[in-house]
UniProtKB/Swiss-Prot annotation:
Transport as UniProt keyword: no
Function: Has antibacterial activity against the Gram-positive bacteria S.aureus and E.faecalis, and the Gram-negative bacteria P.aeruginosa and E.coli. Has antiprotozoal activity against T.cruzi. Has antifungal activity against the yeasts C.tropicalis (MIC=10.1 uM), C.guilliermondii (MIC=20.3 uM), C.albicans (MIC=20.3 uM) and C.albicans ATCC 1023 (MIC=10.1 uM). Decreases viability of murine peritoneal cells. Fuses to, and disrupts liposomes.
Entry superkingdom: Eukaryota
Name of this protein: Dermaseptin-DI1
Chain positions with Valine amide modification: V33
Biological processes, Gene Ontology terms: defense response to bacterium
Main subcellular location: secreted
Cross-referenced InterPro entries: Dermaseptin_dom
Coiled coil (residue ranges): none
Keyword Secreted assigned: yes
GO cellular component assignments: extracellular region
Family that this chain belongs to: Belongs to the frog skin active peptide (FSAP) family. Dermaseptin subfamily.
Tissue expression remark: Expressed by the skin glands.
Length: 33
């Protein structure tokens, strides 16, 4: 139903946000070094 679609979208968004945060952290570290 609708709720499972919303939950799935939230999970995907969280995954994308985590990936973006990890990339940003790596960039910050490589620039700091």
């Amino acid at each position: 139903g609708l709720w499972s679609k919303i939950k799935a979208a939230g999970k995907e968004a969280a995954k994308a946000a985590a990936k973006a945060a990890g990339k940003a952290a790596l960039n910050a570290v490589s620039e700091a070094v």
